[in-house]
Amino acid sequence: LRSEVRGGTAILATDAVRTPAARCLTDLDTLHLDFLQELAARTASSWARSGASLLDEWSARLAQLGDALAPPWRQRLDRAMAVLAAEPSLIASRGLAHGDFTPVNCFRQDSRLCVFDWEYAGAAYPADHDLICLLDAVARLGGDAPAARAQGLEQRLMGELGRSRNEANRRLIAFHCVHALRSLERQPSQADTGLDWYGADEAARTLDALLARASAS
């Protein structure tokens, strides 16, 4: 992995080309963990963010949505931000995030993991964002209900990856807040119906389940 910043733009380069022999890994592998660790190590000095600064940015983005955001979603996101603000250090980022780290956006080439489609890369993501992105994409293949999937991801982060209960829960909440904001920002504003997007109901149920678990912890 080569990385540098030119004129405020992050440049990442790879010399690998996907071939028919390249393998798409359909579950978490040590190659994913090694890649994410290297990405954090190489970008931490320029891209790591405190939890408080992330919350400030997300709150500003939320405010920009204005009256187009339906009251239930505003209340849900306001509640989530308040939960995260109680312990902002739990979501502090370690460096640059890919932003869309799913099995279809990476492949194994010999002993290396090659990652492409960096259009969502940036710094405004919480801790473990890319890891959760991968685990969430894998979990969706199982067809579980949102609440069950959220609980399963919490358990996997704790049991398999050594996160505390609060770390797992808050980082999942932050992950879903970021994706809700991204989805909302991509929608055209419609005065008669407000902002909406495909998958909004499922996202609401998932975030509600995580917030309920946060209250119980």
Explain the meaning of each model-derived region.
Residues 128-162, 176-192:
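Active-site activation/catalytic loop segments of kinase-like enzymes and analogous catalytic loops
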Residues 19-26, 122-123, 142-144:
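Short, polar/flexible loop-turn hinges at active-site or ligand-entry regions and domain interfaces
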Residues 45-98:
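An alpha-helical support segment within catalytic cores of ATP-dependent transferases
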Residues 22, 43-44, 167-176, 210-214:
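Phosphate/pyrophosphate-binding loops and the adjoining catalytic core of nucleotide-dependent enzymes
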Residues 9-11, 158-172:
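Extended charged low-complexity segments that act as oligomerization/scaffolding linkers
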Residues 1-48:
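ATP-binding pocket architecture of kinase catalytic cores
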Residues 85-129:
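Active-site acidic catalytic loop and adjacent metal/ATP-binding pocket
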Residues 8, 199-217:
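Regulatory N- and C-terminal appendages and interdomain linkers associated
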